C-alpha cells in the first residue's frame, strides 16, 4: 500500500467528519479557536496578597448584589465592564462591583445567591482563546470534570441559582467569531445557570463594536429589570474616584509619579521579572528608515535586552509602551480647562472599596494625560453623552444630546472623522468644558495600552537584541478632515530621529517627552515587555515552510529566514523555505531588499522569495495572485508536510490567502472547493497553518 502523505490523511479525515456531521446533525463538531485583540490586560488586575478569592464572600462583605467580571486583553472589555457597573448603579440602583476574572476562584459558584446577578464581559484572544486574565476561569468552567463545592455533577445542574448576563468582544474577520463568550455561555447553560437577555456580541472587524454594545445593553437592562424587579431612575453622575489637588506636594517630590509605570521605576530601582505589569526600560541600539519614498516611513529598530533577564523566541511579540504626543496632551488639557494647572499634584482614590485606581498616584494632571490615559482613541457615543450635564452652554448641550441620541449623526460628525474626545469637543464649541470632573475622564477613558509588534529577528542569532519592523501611521481616512497619526509609531519615529542626530524631532508635526519621566528614558530608551506567541518554526529545520507576508507582515519571516540561514551555516539540514512578499514598488518599499541577498547566499536554492508589486503595472498584483501562480509548488510542499504561515492584514489579505490555499488544495486533490476550505481548517487545528494577523 502506498504511504499516505499528510494531506491524504486530512482528506480522509474531512470526508469522515463530514459523514459524522451529517448523521449526527453536527453534534460532534468542536468549535475551534479564534483570534481577537492583541495586547495586554489591565496592569492593576492581580489580586493582592491577603485579599479573599471568594467572590461570594467579597460581595457579602461589601454589600454588592451585582458583579461584572471581565476578560480583557487590550482594556476594552474592562472598559465595558466599568461602564455597565456605573450604569447599573446610577440608573437602576444596583450595588455593583467590577471584578478581574483572575482575582477569584470559582469552585463555590454553585452557591451564588439567587437574588444577585453576575455579568461576564469576555474578549476572545489568540486562537479563539481566553484573554490572559481569563484562562483559569475558562479552563475551569468549560472543563469536562468541572467540580463545585457541593459535589454536584453537571447533570445535576449545580449552577441553577446563578443568573447571569453575557457580552462578547470579537472580530468577524477571523474564522471563529466570538468563540470565548459562546463557549462560556454554553458551559454556564449546561451547568444550569439562567441567562438574562441575549448573549451580546460586538464586532471589531466590522467597526461596529461600540454600536453593537449600545444596541445590546438596552434590551438587556429591560430583561434584567423584569427579572430582578429593578426600578429605573434618572441617572446622575456619581464619581467612582475622588481626585483631590494636593498643595502639600510638588512635581519635584520623589513620591509623585510623573509617568513612571510602577513603584519600582519611581524609586529608581526597577526589578524583574518584566511583564505586562512591569516593563523594562530598554535601550534602542539602532534605528533606521526602510522606505525610500519620502512621504512614508517604515522603521527598523534594534532594542537591547542584555542583562534584563528578558528572553524571547523567534516568532514572539514585543510590547512598546507609548507616550502621548505633546499637541494632543495640550489639546486635552485646554479643552477641559486644566492647562494652567497641568503640573498640580493630584491624589486619586477609589470611593468604593472594590474600585481599582487605574493611574499611579499621586501624580499630576500633565503626567496622567501624557503617560497614563488613552486620550487619542476614537471617542464613543456613550462617553460623549455622559458630558451633557457639564456642557459650557445650552447650544453645546443640545449638540451633545443630538450626538448621543442619533447614531447616524454621531457617525457623520465624530466617527467618520476619527475624532478623539478633545477633538470632538473642539468641533462642538471653542469654549472649555471646565465643569467636567477629572474623575469622569479617568472612568471614561482607558489606560494607555502597550502596542504589540511581531519580532523581526531570530533569538538564535541575536538573543540580546530584539528587532521590530513598523510602518509609521499617518493617513487621511476617507471623510476625515484631519490626518490620523499612530500613537506609538510616531513616538518611535521621534526616537529614531533623535538617535540619528535630529536635536528637535517632530514626526508629522508631533513632539514627545522622549526623555521620559525625570529623564529616565534619556539616551534613547523605551519601556517594553515580551509576549510569547505560538507562531513558531517547526522544531525540525528540515521541514519545508511557506510564508506569506506582504508589507510589515514580513517581520516575523525575517526572523524565520535569519534563523534558518544561521542553521544552514552551522551545517544543519534546512528544508525548502518559501516567502511570498508583496509591496507597492520594488524601488520604494521593498523591505530588507539587500538583506535577502545575504540569506540567499547562505541558504542557496533552499530559499525562494516570490514577490508581488501592486503598483508597478496597471494591473495590481498581490501575494494571493502569486500564490495561485505557484499552486504546483505550494501543493508539492504541503505533501512534504510543509507548515504554512500568514502574517499581516486579517480583513483582506489573510482571508484571500486562506481562500486561495483552499482552492489550491481542492484542485490538486480533485475535490470540491468546500472540501479544500475544510482541509485548511484542519491544518489550522493541527498547527500546520498558522496566522499572526491584525485588523
From Swiss-Prot:
This is NADPH--cytochrome P450 reductase. This enzyme is required for electron transfer from NADP to cytochrome P450 in microsomes. It can also provide electron transfer to heme oxygenase and cytochrome B5. Involved in ergosterol biosynthesis. The chain crosses the membrane at residues 9-31. Residues 32-695 are cytoplasmic. GO terms for molecular function: flavin adenine dinucleotide binding; FMN binding; NADP binding; NADPH-hemoprotein reductase activity. SUPFAM superfamilies: Ferredoxin reductase-like, C-terminal NADP-linked domain (SSF52343), Flavoproteins (SSF52218), Riboflavin synthase domain-like (SSF63380). Binds 1 FAD per monomer. One of its GO terms (cellular component) is cytosol. FMN binds at residues 72-77, 123-126, 169-178, 204. It is found in: Endoplasmic reticulum membrane; Mitochondrion outer membrane; Cell membrane. The keyword Transcription regulation does not apply. Residues 1-8 are lumenal. Belongs to the NADPH--cytochrome P450 reductase family. NADP(+) binds at residues 296, 552, 614-615, 620-624, 656. One of its GO terms (biological process) is ergosterol biosynthetic process. Pfam families: FAD_binding_1, Flavodoxin_1, NAD_binding_1. Its cofactor is FAD; FMN. It catalyses: 2 oxidized [cytochrome P450] + NADPH = 2 reduced [cytochrome P450] + NADP(+) + H(+). FAD binds at residues 451-454, 469-471, 486-489, 694. Residues 277-538 form the FAD-binding FR-type domain. It is a single-pass membrane protein. The gene is cprA. Keywords: Cell membrane, Endoplasmic reticulum, FAD, Flavoprotein, FMN, Lipid biosynthesis, Lipid metabolism, Membrane, Mitochondrion, Mitochondrion outer membrane, NADP, Oxidoreductase, Steroid biosynthesis, Steroid metabolism, Sterol biosynthesis, Sterol metabolism, Transmembrane, Transmembrane helix. CDD domains: CYPOR. It comes from the Eukaryota. It comes from Aspergillus fumigatus (strain ATCC MYA-4609 / CBS 101355 / FGSC A1100 / Af293).
